[in-house]
Amino acid sequence: MAPAVKAGMKRRHVEDVEPAEDFTNVYGSHYATQDMPCDDIPDDSMPPEVAYRMIKDELSLDNNPKLNLASFVSTYMEKEAEDLMLEAMSKNFIDFEEYPQTAEIHHRCANMIANLFHAPKDIGIGSSSVGSSEAIMLAVLAMKRRWKQQRQQQGKPADNPNIVMSSAVQVCWEKAARYFEIEEKYVNCTRTRFVIDPKEAVELCDENTIGIVAILGTTYTGAYEDVKAISDLLVEKKSDVPIHVDAASGGFVAPFVVPDLEWDFRVERVVSINVSGHKYGLVYPGVGWVVWRSSEYLPKDLIFNINYLGAEQTSFTLNFSKGASQVIGQYYQLIRLGKAGYRHIMCNLTKTADYLTDELRKLGFVIMSEGHGKSLPLVAFRFAGKEEGETEEKEFDEFALAHYLRSRGWVIPAYTMAPETGQMKMMRIVVREDFSRSRCELLIKDIKLCSQLLEKDSEQLIMRLKQHIGQHTSGSGKIRDPMGAAKAVFKNESHSLQGKTGKSHAVC
């Protein structure tokens, strides 16, 4: 029973209570009862603790990065590395005159990575980028320009360049070809081969081919494509077509786990390599690196000599201003860990991936990744089908399992494989530095649980959960998406591999 109101006292309603402007608790201020600014910059300022708390609360709805096993991107660095990067946040990397030691650290990183990839001593050249996508754009530009110059010197037309690559390439390769007007020639995967076929790749080459792309760690299954076999066939044919190695994921794995594997500048026809520092280079995003065998493969007319803020500098980038933090973070990891540290970490990740592979195989999944150091530390798998002797068709697929795992907090993607694989569906778990054996055990239990739930649940229930999670991951729907109009217009595009074949653009 509610207490009676004393005589002379006024009953106060919620609407009558005005939030105190000087209230020390964020949630006692009027900001807690208002929507966050969405379209227009607010007229008035707000206290820093309020802005911080409101944004932090919104970000808590994001997935936990440690449970995001879709991405190769690093989610752990030591506090000392984080402190160095925080202290350098205000430095603009491009200001060489003002920050000469930062430039020196960049050069050290580029040299270390070039030497790791066995670039010829003192003539290999390299540069940082904001990630492998920019590095790939730069490498493609260099290959195209060099091919064009050779054609012009021979008095031949140079208006129809093409590039040969596997249909399992990451979408940035499609972008590079499209943006720079280069014809894409694909070597399609099959249901039993998920990498490029060296012989077919070389046969696709003609006088207009600017280069062949070989992937050291494919996006889907983590497989290492046979760079040396491609090179040997080119040499045998006396073809001068160069090879670029996309080592975005594998460039910091293979040298430490399988050091005898020849994929880098030890291979005759390899002229350039890209690698992501923010993947198995163990740095927070975003930093990448691109290295050329020598200046011969980087045409001079792509290089800009700039006098910027009083300093002469050589530039070959798509970006200009960028933070110095990631380069400093990369240098910390290289000298802190050394080759021994990287070797221990990469071998541990490989062991964890192999253990996870064995456990998933016991649960009846078909394993698509090679493992045992012969590929990236990831596990690619799918449900068994008719090819494996299954007689009954399941009411659910890999996408349904991915949605059920999302309800447990795990972000594990499902994909439709590359063209010519019969719309094969698969899932991929990336084993990163902070994915311990104990966390691996918890994941295995949840995969087993979700698989059992899928067996019991109806098709309608599975579909409702998919729709629910799809709406949750696409945001509240209240805010106008600046790219919304473009999405509506280009939703059914048919110029990409995804639009043409249904292949999923995999998370990198």
For each feature predicted by the language model, list its residue ranges.
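Hydrophobic alpha-helix feature that most strongly marks membrane-spanning transmembrane helices
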Residues: T209, V213-A214, V235, V253, ...
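Active-site C-terminal subdomain of aminotransferase-like
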Residues: H244, F256-P377, F381-E390, K394
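A short glycine/serine-rich beta->alpha loop
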Residues: P37, A70-V73, F93-E97, D122-V130, ...
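Conserved PLP-enzyme active-site core in the AAT-like
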Residues: H13, V17-T24, V130-F304, L309-E312, ...
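Structured alpha-helical segments in the cores of large, soluble enzyme domains
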Residues: H106-I113, V169-E174, D197-C205, N319-Q326, ...
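Secondary-structure capping and boundary motifs in well-ordered enzyme cores
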Residues: Q101, S128-A135, M165, V169, ...
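Non-catalytic terminal extensions of PLP-dependent enzymes
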Residues: M1-N111, N115-P120, L141, W147, ...
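Glycine- and acidic
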Residues: S90-E97, P120-S127, A158-N160, E184-C189, ...
